[in-house]
Each structure stands twice: as C-alpha cells, then as structure tokens.
Amino acid sequence: MTRIDGRTNDQLRDVTFQLDIAPLAHGSVLVGFGETRVICSAMLEKGVPRWMMHQNVQGGWLTAEYSMLPYSTLQRKSRDISRGKLDGRSSEIQRLIGRSLRAVVDLKKLGQRTLWIDCDVLRADGGTRTASITGACVAVEMAFQRFITAKKLESSPMEKLAAAVSAGIW
C-alpha cells in the first residue's frame, strides 16, 4: 500500500535541518519532516523559576513553548493570545517537548540558568510534535556549543540525544 505522498508504509518522511535560522537565538534550526516545517530555537538566560529557589532545587531549568502559526494549516488557526488561553493540544505538546528534553539534559550542569525552547510551526502537514522534539534537540545542543565556545559552560549538559517519529497503521 502506498500513501498519498507516495511513501511506502515503512518509509519515514524526508528529514531536513537548516541551521542558524534565527541569528539572535543561541541555537536555532528550521526542521522539515516531509512538508511539515518548524522553527526551533533555544535561548539560555540567567535565573531559574521562583519555585526552584523556594524549594532550594540545585541547577537550572528547561521549559518549552509550542505554537502553530495562523497560516500553518489550510484553515487559519487563531493565535492562542487572541483566545486568551493556550489550547489543550498546544499545551500538551509543549509539555511533551519540555519533558523529552529534560530527560536528556543534565540540569545541574546549567547552573542557575533557564533554557527556553521555542517551537513555531510554519507548516503543519503531520508530525509537528515529533519534528519539534527533534529540532529542539538540535537547537539546544547548538546553544550549548556556543556557550562552551564562549567559556560560559565547561561541557555540554546534553547527556543523550532525543529524536522522535510517530507511526500509525490504517
């Protein structure tokens, strides 16, 4: 059986990475999974969330934000800000991105820093969450390498790499 886009059932979408897509970010990539396109960026900033200070938690923090731009789908998708709240799907996906990256980053090596990951979907043609996780991992390691070069980190806090794919049978 062949899919609409011509792939066989056991064939992944083509995966592409265009690095340094956002020059002011510490790490950034435009990731493509087939026709899906997501800009993933990583920024390190001083300070940690208040809850970490109040609970005397050592190390840093990593958090993610995920958004589908209005023109990313065939039918315009309203921005979360215009509705006054994050939609449930976006909230679930950004938590998944954060958890996936926290699983492979040694937060203690960040020191008192917060690592912000932003994933902005330019085109949604399936696999936005998997593209976001994979692209975010690339952007995070790029940010770490920049901080190592600038002597702001001794070594990369990335202990493993994270990548994601999804598969379905129908």
Model-derived regions: residue spans:
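Conserved mixed alpha/beta catalytic, RNA-binding, or beta-rich assembly cores of soluble enzyme
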Residues: 95, 116-146
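Broad gene-expression machinery/nucleic-acid interaction feature
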Residues: 12-16, 26-28, 35-39, 59-63, ...
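Compositionally biased, non-globular sequence tracts
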Residues: 2-7, 81, 153-154
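Glycine-rich, flexible beta-strand/loop modules in the N-terminal catalytic cores of phosphate-handling
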Residues: 21, 29-110
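Short, structured patches in soluble enzyme cores that scaffold and shape functional sites
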Residues: 19, 35, 68, 119-121, ...
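A structural signal for small-residue-enriched, beta-sheet-centric alpha/beta enzyme cores
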Residues: 88, 108-112, 127-131, 141, ...
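Short, Gly/Pro- and small/polar-rich lid/capping loops
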Residues: 1-25
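Short alpha-helical basic/polar micro-motif
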Residues: 28-29, 134
